[in-house]
């Protein structure tokens, strides 16, 4: 989860987030190298006579600065397309959970079970227990089995929302009248926090998301107790 004055991304807890962090580092290195080269050339132009005012045509130079950026863009695009494909691909999910955005709370329905549905509201600051996080704790957590592919179906009852859990690499728009889907897979147990990431009204900041990833046996016991 996030912590004060954090500069980097949250620790990856899913295969998708691991790939996103690797892609971020890959792209950042390319940007750093290009920026360093440009600054070096600018410094040479300012401190030396690295100019040719009489040059009217430089076919070789124009070819280089056309082909080289194209190659760089391809090096950035290929891993990006790979991750997009991974995020859209859902193979044999063991569980499907439908989540609906409301002003200003989330509702969840486990479609593989009968009558397993609930609303999830933020816990007010005055009702927090020791150890619970302000503006992030909810009264009903979404309990899911870890290390298994889970399909999330996401929509909205009223306005645009966005269901996001950064440490799992998840951010999917909740659009009225449209059903979007995302894959949830966690490498480890724990609590994973997120929030609505689309400005949806005056209480937009009070729509937290809490996923509790547990071993399959614990999930089966929890689901049996909820039905």
UniProtKB/Swiss-Prot annotation:
UniProt remark on cofactor binding: Binds a dinuclear copper A center per subunit.
GO molecular-function term, one example from the UniProt record: cytochrome-c oxidase activity
Topological domain spans for side Mitochondrial intermembrane: 1-14, 88-227
Record-annotated membrane-spanning stretches: 15-45, 60-87
Assigned GO CC terms: mitochondrial inner membrane; respiratory chain complex IV
Alphabetized CDD domains for the sequence: CcO_II_C
The keyword Ligase appears for this protein: no
Membrane topology of the entry: Multi-pass membrane protein
InterPro entries, per the entry: CcO_II (IPR045187), CcO_II-like_C (IPR002429), CcO_II_C (IPR034210), Copper_CuA (IPR001505), Cupredoxin (IPR008972), Cyt_c_oxidase_su2 (IPR014222), Cyt_c_oxidase_su2_TM_dom (IPR011759), Cyt_c_oxidase_su2_TM_sf (IPR036257)
Binding site for Cu cation A2: 196, 198, 200, 204
Main subcellular location: mitochondrion
Residues bound to Mg(2+): 198
Binding site for Cu cation A1: 161, 196, 200, 207
Cofactor field: Cu cation
PANTHER family cross-referenced by the UniProt entry: CYTOCHROME C OXIDASE SUBUNIT 2, CYTOCHROME C OXIDASE, SUBUNIT II
Protein family per UniProt: Belongs to the cytochrome c oxidase subunit 2 family.
Subunit structure: Component of the cytochrome c oxidase (complex IV, CIV), a multisubunit enzyme composed of 14 subunits. The complex is composed of a catalytic core of 3 subunits MT-CO1, MT-CO2 and MT-CO3, encoded in the mitochondrial DNA, and 11 supernumerary subunits COX4I, COX5A, COX5B, COX6A, COX6B, COX6C, COX7A, COX7B, COX7C, COX8 and NDUFA4, which are encoded in the nuclear genome.
Role this protein plays: Component of the cytochrome c oxidase, the last enzyme in the mitochondrial electron transport chain which drives oxidative phosphorylation. The respiratory chain contains 3 multisubunit complexes succinate dehydrogenase (complex II, CII), ubiquinol-cytochrome c oxidoreductase (cytochrome b-c1 complex, complex III, CIII) and cytochrome c oxidase (complex IV, CIV), that cooperate to transfer electrons derived from NADH and succinate to molecular oxygen, creating an electrochemical gradient over the inner membrane that drives transmembrane transport and the ATP synthase.
Protein name, UniProt field: Cytochrome c oxidase subunit 2
Species for this entry: Hylomyscus parvus
